Amino acid sequence: MSSDADMAIFGEAAPYLRKSEKERIEAQNKPFDAKSSVFVADPKESFVKATVQSREGGKVTAKTEAGATVTVKEDQVFPMNPPKYDKIEDMAMMTHLHEPAVLYNLKERYAAWMIYTYSGLFCVTVNPYKWLPVYNAEVVTAYRGKKRQEAPPHIFSISDNAYQFMLTDRENQSILITGESGAGKTVNTKRVIQYFATIAVTGDKKKEEATSGKMQGTLEDQIISANPLLEAFGNAKTVRNDNSSRFGKFIRIHFGTTGKLASADIETYLLEKSRVTFQLKAERSYHIFYQIMSNKKPDLIEMLLITTNPYDYAFVSQGEITVPSIDDQEELMATDSAIDILGFTSDERVSIYKLTGAVMHYGNMKFKQKQREEQAEPDGTEVADKAAYLQSLNSADLLKALCYPRVKVGNEYVTKGQTVQQVYNAVGALAKAVYEKMFLWMVTRINQQLDTKQPRQYFIGVLDIAGFEIFDFNSLEQLCINFTNEKLQQFFNHHMFVLEQEEYKKEGIEWEFIDFGMDLAACIELIEKPMGIFSILEEECMFPKATDTSFKNKLYEQHLGKSNNFQKPKPAKGKVEAHFSLVHYAGTVDYNITGWLDKNKDPLNETVVGLYQKSAMKTLAFLFTGTAAAEAEGGGKKGGKKKGSSFQTVSALFRENLNKLMTNLRSTHPHFVRCIIPNETKTPGAMEHELVLHQLRCNGVLEGIRICRKGFPSRILYADFKQRYKVLNASAIPEGQFIDSKKASEKLLGSIDVDHTQYKFGHTKVFFKAGLLGLLEEMRDDKLAQLITRTQAMCRGFLARVEYKKMVERRESIFCIQYNIRAFMNVKHWPWMKLYFKIKPLLKSAETEKEMANMKEEFEKTKESLAKAEAKRKELEEKMVALMQEKNDLQLQVQAEADSLADAEERCDQLIKTKIQLEAKIKEVTERAEDEEEINAELTAKKRKLEDECSELKKDIDDLELTLAKVEKEKHATENKVKNLTEEMAGLDETIAKLTKEKKALQEAHQQTLDDLQAEEDKVNTLTKAKTKLEQQVDDLEGSLEQEKKIRMDLERAKRKLEGDLKLAQESTMDIENDKQQLDEKLKKKEFEMSNLQSKIEDEQALAMQLQKKIKELQARIEELEEEIEAERASRAKAEKQRSDLSRELEEISERLEEAGGATSAQIEMNKKREAEFQKMRRDLEEATLQHEATAATLRKKHADSVAELGEQIDNLQRVKQKLEKEKSELKMEIDDLASNMETVSKAKGNLEKMCRTLEDQVSELKTKEEEHQRLINDLSAQRARLQTESGEFSRQLDEKDSLVSQLSRGKQAFTQQIEELKRQLEEEIKAKSALAHALQSARHDCDLLREQYEEEQEAKAELQRAMSKANSEVAQWRTKYETDAIQRTEELEEAKKKLAQRLQDAEEHVEAVNAKCASLEKTKQRLQNEVEDLMIDVERTNAACAALDKKQRNFDKILAEWKHKYEETHAELEASQKESRSLSTELFKVKNAYEESLDQLETLKRENKNLQQEISDLTEQIAEGGKRIHELEKVKKQVEQEKSELQAALEEAEASLEHEEGKILRIQLELNQVKSEIDRKIAEKDEEIDQLKRNHIRVVESMQSTLDAEIRSRNDAIRIKKKMEGDLNEMEIQLNHANRMAAEALRNYRNTQGILKDTQLHLDDALRGQEDLKEQLAMVERRANLLQAEIEELRATLEQTERSRKVAEQELLDASERVQLLHTQNTSLINTKKKLETDISQIQGEMEDIVQEARNAEEKAKKAITDAAMMAEELKKEQDTSAHLERMKKNMEQTVKDLQHRLDEAEQLALKGGKKQIQKLEARVRELEAEVESEQKRNVEAVKGLRKHERRVKELTYQTEEDRKNVLRLQDLVDKLQAKVKSYKRQAEEAEEQSNVNLSKFRKLQHELEEAEERADIAESQVNKLRVKSREVHTKVISEE
């Protein structure tokens, strides 16, 4: 522990990092009982502190801190650590290591704002949720170069250790930062980067000057500029965090050889791409979508073809769309500037935005199912056109690729049909893939920008990744995250084991090493090894027919019961189903495997991917080039190194990335940081125990403690152990001789009764198992208690012995004295003794005389010295009196200062309290505002959802209308076909038999081909399995090249053979399938034509019936609409009448208010005149009280302003709330209307579906009949002649039916014309209705405007009243001379207030009268229908007025926009000038850098030139050597010539040799020429290389120039961010200066009060006079207080009046409810009329009882249901039931018709035997039954029409009640405003009361100061008197002695 002086270097951060010395000493001296102080388990708090009271039978009874007594088991009790371990910095050093000790240590440190704590190798950080001063530059420099144990825990300490290890060990480092979302991972990552950037740039002070212009914060600035881009595309709002990173990242910061920053790069992991298409309710998608739609850049909206409403796009509007803490507009500008800074080109920027917009459009693409097919088709192409345009694709190709993708089968491509759901899944997968690939591409581009190309040697990696996740629903994403954390924990355990091993090895400890990294091996192998979860998942993904169930079954077969980590979860109520559980180190997690196969495959539509690759957008094509390459590689090589590269699953890719990460981490020295969320509510200082414990388990802190406990976690140096625990057995260590500390510790531990296996001796330390040190501490405490007791006993014995010894000595001395006295008494009468007594004094007389003389001399001397001393004493006394006087004066002054200081402190405390109260109020108001905003957001979301549903319903209605039109067209077509088909009927009868035979034969052949196809598929599957095995063998046998070649040749031969077989099989199957398809199509055509022939006639009859019904329904609808229009007109008249009455009332009230305002203004004028008269008197008073009132007045004003603002905010919020409630009610009405429309549509849909089903049944029956006819034709071929005659009869009947069909079609055409005419009339009525609704809306708007004017008048009145109260308060301070006048004026004002209140009450009574009139007008509403036209004219006038007002508003808006534009232009010019200045400064900096870099390049070029010159010199030397060789050859030539001259005799031989030598010379010359040419060529190449190098250097210079420009841009951006931060800092400094000014003002007040007190002490008489004046003022204030009290009572009276008005409003509400009741009675009368109509219907139905028994029963049930119904909703339901019964009756009738048809068929058979008459009778009976059915259906339609009419009546009544409720709400608003006035009056009274209290406190204070001054004067006077008395006494004593 360092001292407070050592901590001074941390500055203001010191108290947030380490305890002070005082706290440490207090903790060590705190009383503590190790046996009784424990933690016990608690169900609420997890663990609580307690004191053990008893232990019995394995149970412990303890008393908690809260006073509760609990009894728990022994294993739920945990011992507490001694107080010296409180707030310990490294939790691994605690005596007792367990969960509650860790929890409470973290909690106590967090309460003291020490957020960083070590736990062994971990650094645990708790999110403070507020700013702490622990990251400033002072702290950075303090941690620089410090070891871990030398400084308090901090993220800077971890960073500095990593940096120092990198420099000293020359090893890469890594910092692993994990934790849940919102725990502070990203913030700590930024702090790490900040630290490295600071120390690495300013690290080498010797070269500081040289590097000052190069890398000053460059890396940090670049990463900061990358952050907005990464956060925009990778961050989103979650439940816990508004800006949560939805991806992990590993940031590598590279350093050069000297430790300077070199470059950086980023790797990302596990981007949550599912968020692109799906979000939870409380979350939202990635920020970029909402930034674009914030409309900060309108050109983006136009470019992307989108709107600014997120609810228009399904992918981004499933959750919330706004975040209060994020400004999307500012974030968009930051993102846009980051794109520029990071060097993206303009095309790339546009591509990024376009791809983002395309993803949004993908979510709006609609598809529907084709009729009679499962094939999907586009439902509109508008959205697809936009998406394709943004991606530079062809819209038709895109839609075709989505609905009809091409699939490769063998070597051919086949078009495959897609269902609607499959298409939607494909669209979602494409959107996610585009977004993910774009994000990864942006990361790659950022890395290219961050790579500065500087030399780098080592790096420090910072891993920011999500922690362990255990949710209620855990899917594949959670398994990946948890598996990552499992691997990281294994890595930590192994690393910790290695460190422990090194420690034990260094200390020479014998220990059985356990690799704790293997503890997690079982779980990891279960997931990643062969036949593990991932392996099985990937295997299942390869099988086409695999499902989630088959995957689950395989998991169970493979692992259930075989692995302890794999379990089957127990079903829990209320939770999502779980399929299997895994036992992780952090707990057991239940996983749900739904959709894992699809997630893992993550299939993409390959056809669309092909379109992407061919896109004209380069970025999109580049993003998907890798996909094509992978396919080519997978398809072409078939046996490369990367197996299955064309089919890489998500899990395989994840494992590959994870393995790379683990490889990186294993190559580094790791440091671990764990981030903790203290609570879910983001409250600073609060900690939730269960939440923190869950995180400690999940992030491995408790796992690390477990590993510590397995070894020897506690370790102490021998010297420290000997010194502390020697007391346990001091005899074990011999005294008086030297002994080594290690031997002493061994002897000491050997002599103590402890388990000797629980400790080990190292070279320098003794190591203990967990808990043993605590046991030694307890033994030491017991031993110390014994020793202290023994010491106390010895001390008490020693003191008793000393006392006894004194008593014995006293007794002996007494005995001696008694003996001597007795002896003297015996000898005093002896004569010799008497002589001795007489002589003895005479012997000393001479000596006494001498002594007397000496004494006289001494007396004289002392007398002189006394006189001198007396003189000195007098002087000193005088000085003392003067000093005492000064002392008293100083004491009085100090006392006065202390009093004034106390007063100032009291005032300061009061100010702080008021500030806290105001802050609390502000917080409450902001919370309320946030709640209201949340409610508003929910309502708007609901509104959007309803609008979407409404639009969907409209689309459904449009679709139904389209289908109806299609059906009508088909009907016309089929009418033409019927004629043709009747002619072809005879021919088709003959061909049917042949076709059926052919069909059977084809079916058999089709079955045979299916069997063959299945066999071929089995073969293909076996072949694919064999192929995969062979590919595995190829991958495994890469070691030897020769074997691989042989195996590859064999495999290729087998593959070619198999492919040939496969092609043949596929070709044969394709041929068979084509034949089969052709035959099926022919067969379907024939069957379809046959079924059409039989069914079209019946369809046409049913259609004619339906059209007749529709005509009747539309006629009824027209009547109903006419009735509705009449009712609407009546309600309009009523509403207009009410509006005119209300407007008259508002005008009267406004006139009254103006009168009151005139009175108050006249009163104000009088007050101003009086003010002018009293100006002089008031100045004198203000000068006297200015200094005392200044601070109070400012505070009052601030308080009043803040209260007024809060009140206004509350009023605004209430108004917003009321508006929202109105909108809510209107939305509810719309919901009801939509629900009713939905019901009608669903009923119509159900009817259509029933009709379809019946038609299908009829078709099937006709098919069966067709087969029977076929058999009859085959059986009765002999009777063909007779049948021909019968066929003539049938043809006649067919002609009759044709004529009937033509008649029906003509009737249908007439009906369609009528329908169109009715539709046109209906549209006209709807238009008229909408015009009326618009008029009503405008009238409401006028009413709202009038209401707002009224509110403004009310506010003006309140302002006047506040001014009046201020004038009253000023008048009250005037002299008593004018008090009576002021009182009279206030009384007059009060009378005016009373009059105003009376007028308001009259107005309220008038409102009541108006409501009564409304009730009477309700009864006479029929008479007011004639006034509708006049009201419509008024409405038009009001509309014109509104239009004029709107025009004025638009003009004003235009002027405002122009001024805004001017402001923006001037602001832009200012920014441009600032930018210019910055660019000039940066250009200067750039030129300097360029100059330095050019100098460096010049030096490098010089060095390269030297090297080239050296090479040239070498070449010239070689040429010189060649010249020497030539010279030597010339010498040889000369010698040969000499020999020639000498040997002329042998001329021929010499000539031959000469020729030979010349040949040699020629060859040598040739060689020399070749050498020369080679040298020339090399020189030319070198010249070219030099030129190439020059060009390369020029390019490098250009690239460096571009990077320098990018750096300058990033630096400018950083400067901008820095300026922004400086602006924030300036604001904070302004706040600080404001606080300092407040303190300085308080100090000035204190000094002023000091001066005032000095004046009062100097002038007591003036103070007395001032006291009298203050008494007079007090009397005046009391009178004013009485007046205010009377005013408060009057305000209470007005409050009671408002209460009465509220009751009146409630009475009006009751009247409205009575009116509703009256309407209800009218409704019941209508119901009675409806019942009468229904009885008529039942009578008509009664006529059919003999024909249809079921219809009569249904009608009786309907009667019973109608009579039993009590409520309107039940009657509607019963009516629906009756309609359903009638529908069933219709079905029954249709069934009877079918039965009759069957009988008719039988009759036809009988007719063969001669029964034609019977057939005719049956046909007549059938026609009668059909007519009856038709009449019954008509009656049913009429009943439904009446039911709908009553439903509309109910809606009208509900609408009327809603209008009444709105009127009540308006009255309630009026009451609320009156209450607000009352509150303002109360507030004024409170302000006056506060002012009186302040004056009273000032008076009391001055009176108290006066009394104290009098007391001090009395005390001083008494002290002076005492001193005088004393001086007199001394003087008298001196005189008497003289």
Swiss-Prot record:
Positions of modified residues (Pros-methylhistidine): H756
Entry GO MF terms: actin filament binding; ATP binding; calmodulin binding; microfilament motor activity
Domain Myosin N-terminal SH3-like: 33-82
Residue stretches making up the Myosin motor domain: 86-781
Description of its domains: The rodlike tail sequence is highly repetitive, showing cycles of a 28-residue repeat pattern composed of 4 heptapeptides, characteristic for alpha-helical coiled coils. Limited proteolysis of myosin heavy chain produces 1 light meromyosin (LMM) and 1 heavy meromyosin (HMM). HMM can be further cleaved into 2 globular subfragments (S1) and 1 rod-shaped subfragment (S2).
UniProt-annotated binding residues for ATP: G179, E180, S181, G182, A183, G184, K185, T186
Subunit structure: Muscle myosin is a hexameric protein that consists of 2 heavy chain subunits (MHC), 2 alkali light chain subunits (MLC) and 2 regulatory light chain subunits (MLC-2).
The IQ domain, residue ranges: 784-813
CDD domains found in the cross-reference section: MYSc_Myh1_mammals (cd14910)
Phosphotyrosine modification, residue list: Y389, Y424, Y1463, Y1491
Function, in words: Muscle contraction.
Family, as annotated: Belongs to the TRAFAC class myosin-kinesin ATPase superfamily. Myosin family.
Protein name according to UniProt: Myosin-4
Annotated stretches, region: Actin-binding: 658-680, 760-774
Major location (coarse): cytoplasm
Gene Ontology BP, a term: muscle contraction
Protein origin, superkingdom: Eukaryota
